[in-house]
């Protein structure tokens, strides 16, 4: 554990120094290719940093924050786009907005109108899920089918909400939420575009979808340009998830996750085309059941297979236990001495 924490300090120390360089040097360079060339060495470094970890909790977090989000932010920053514009007022804020999964809130937060019991309920489910993993063998298959997606959503939502709350206090500004109750999605377009992982969606839109659509509009009809933008975005998302799985498992990619996102890209594009031709006549509740059901089934077939085979959730639980034991020993030794 001590070696892993030393690696953590070195990796994130390197990240902070690199982002500080981006704040002082590339920001003074004219936007475009020259600024892009000045940030590319940092992007390459961020792709390497997760490989210094053994623990999945550190490698996956670093991959998500640096290899994916920070790299996209810096590439968009090179062209005066993305969440780093306008340039934060000081270095500390620039480091936070670059390295952490946060985005300055630009619109009123609709989640403020949610009942007060929603967050405590999620925390209670989070605690329950931490304990129910020990009884996985005893659970019926139909329950296990929904356990992985529920676990993924609740863990991410609770932890990222806590991070947002702390950084809202530290930075003294309102931050965008990461999720907008995705279980209420009435379509795949609603789920991926407006409810699930909004931080990533806000980066994919200017970073992948809009450029591809803009280029394709000169070659084909606007409908096909939208389709190409949609498919490219989902394909890139699939490759990025394959990269994260590689950082965690250090195994050859299976492309299962890529096919999951390609499938959802096709289905989302078809859904958008159908909605343009006709109006939905189904009730919102039925649409939610169909949408969530499709996500759960396809996720079980293509998305969560690698997680289950690699025992990632169990490994993370063991890593958390090791970390807690390490802290207890250090505190005990400190109090005794």
UniProtKB/Swiss-Prot annotation:
Subcellular localization, as worded in the UniProt entry: Membrane
Q: Where would you say this protein principally sits, based on its record?
A: membrane
Query: Any keyword Transferase?
Result: yes
Which residue spans traverse the membrane? 7-27, 38-58, 59-79, 82-102, 142-162, 228-248, 254-274, 285-305
Describe the task this protein carries out: Catalyzes the final step in the synthesis of long-chain linear esters (waxes).
Q: Which UniProt keywords apply?
A: Acyltransferase, Lipid biosynthesis, Lipid metabolism, Membrane, Transferase, Transmembrane, Transmembrane helix
Q: Which GO terms describe its molecular function?
A: long-chain-alcohol O-fatty-acyltransferase activity
Q: Which GO terms describe its biological process?
A: lipid metabolic process
Which InterPro entries does the record cross-reference, listed alphabetically?
Wax_synthase, Wax_synthase_dom, Wax_synthase_Magnoliopsida
Please list the reactions this protein catalyses. Answer: a long chain fatty alcohol + a fatty acyl-CoA = a wax ester + CoA
Signal sequence span per UniProt?
A: none
Q: Which PANTHER family match?
A: LONG-CHAIN-ALCOHOL O-FATTY-ACYLTRANSFERASE 10-RELATED, LONG-CHAIN-ALCOHOL O-FATTY-ACYLTRANSFERASE 3-RELATED
- Spell out the protein name for this chain: Putative long-chain-alcohol O-fatty-acyltransferase 10
Disulphide linkage map? none
Family assignment from sequence similarity: Belongs to the wax synthase family.
Q: How does the record say this protein sits in the membrane? A: Multi-pass membrane protein
The protein's enzyme class: transferase
Q: Which GO terms describe its cellular component?
A: membrane
Q: What EC number(s) would the UniProt record show?
A: 2.3.1.75
């Amino acid at each position: 554990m001590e070696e892993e924490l030393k690696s953590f300090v070195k990796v994130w120390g390197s990240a902070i120094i690199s982002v500080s360089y981006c704040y002082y040097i590339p920001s003074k360079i004219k936007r475009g290719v020259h600024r892009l060339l000045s940030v590319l060495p940092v992007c390459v470094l961020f792709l390497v940093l997760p490989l210094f970890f053994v623990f999945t909790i550190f490698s996956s977090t670093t991959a998500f924050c640096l290899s994916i989000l920070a790299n996209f932010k810096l590439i968009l920053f090179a062209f005066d786009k993305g969440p780093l514009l306008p340039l934060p007022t000081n270095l500390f804020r620039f480091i936070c907005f670059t390295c952490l999964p946060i985005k300055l809130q630009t619109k009123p937060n609709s989640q403020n109108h949610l009942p007060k019991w929603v967050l405590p309920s999620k925390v209670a489910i989070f605690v329950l899920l931490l304990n129910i993993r020990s009884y996985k063998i005893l659970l019926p298959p139909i329950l296990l089918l929904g356990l992985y997606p529920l676990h993924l959503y609740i863990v991410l939502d609770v932890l990222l909400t806590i991070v947002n709350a702390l950084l809202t206090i530290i930075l003294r500004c309102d931050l965008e939420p990461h999720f907008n109750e995705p279980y209420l999605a009435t379509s795949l377009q609603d789920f991926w575009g407006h409810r699930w992982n909004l931080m990533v969606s806000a980066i994919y839109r200017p970073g992948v979808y809009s450029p591809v659509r803009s280029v394709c509009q000169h070659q084909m009809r606007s409908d096909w340009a939208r389709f190409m933008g949609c498919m490219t975005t989902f394909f890139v998302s699939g490759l990025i998830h394959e990269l994260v799985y590689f950082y965690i498992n250090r195994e050859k990619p299976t492309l299962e996750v890529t096919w999951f996102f390609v499938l959802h890209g096709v289905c989302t594009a078809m859904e958008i085309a159908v909605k343009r031709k006709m109006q939905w006549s189904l009730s919102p509740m039925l649409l939610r059941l169909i949408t969530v059901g499709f996500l759960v089934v396809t996720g079980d077939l293509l998305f969560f297979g690698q997680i289950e085979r690699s025992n990632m959730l169990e490994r993370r639980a063991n890593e958390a236990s090791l970390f807690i034991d390490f802290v207890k020993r250090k505190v005990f030794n400190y109090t005794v001495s």
